[in-house]
UniProtKB/Swiss-Prot annotation:
BP term (GO), one: fatty acid metabolic process
Obligatory cofactor(s): pantetheine 4'-phosphate
UniProt-recorded name of the protein: Acyl carrier protein TtuC
Summary of the function given for this chain in its UniProt record: Carrier protein likely involved in the biosynthesis of a polyyne metabolite. Accepts as substrate the activated form of decanoic acid from TtuA.
Alphabetical keyword list: Fatty acid metabolism, Lipid metabolism, Phosphopantetheine, Phosphoprotein
Pfam entry (one): PP-binding
Location of O-(pantetheine 4'-phosphoryl)serine modifications: 48
Domain Carrier: 11-87
Amino acid sequence: MTTVETLEPTITAEDVQQWLAEYIADVLEISESAIDFDTPFHQFGLDSSAVVGLVADLSEWSGVAIGIKSIRKNNSIHALSQFIAAK
């Protein structure tokens, strides 16, 4: 008997970085090229409602349940993308 495994698609850190750069650039109405992946999130100037939206949308997109604490502990695009990719 042959067993068939179904694999869920893997999200890489690079996928998350791209998603976050697009999201933040859209919210701030700036070019994605202006986004530095090592800049702490609070330096982007996102207000609290934008951060809540980011958390909800990123959780839905990635399938990884994250919260505000995850962003505080992984306070840059680079750090958060590594955290999510490891889940």
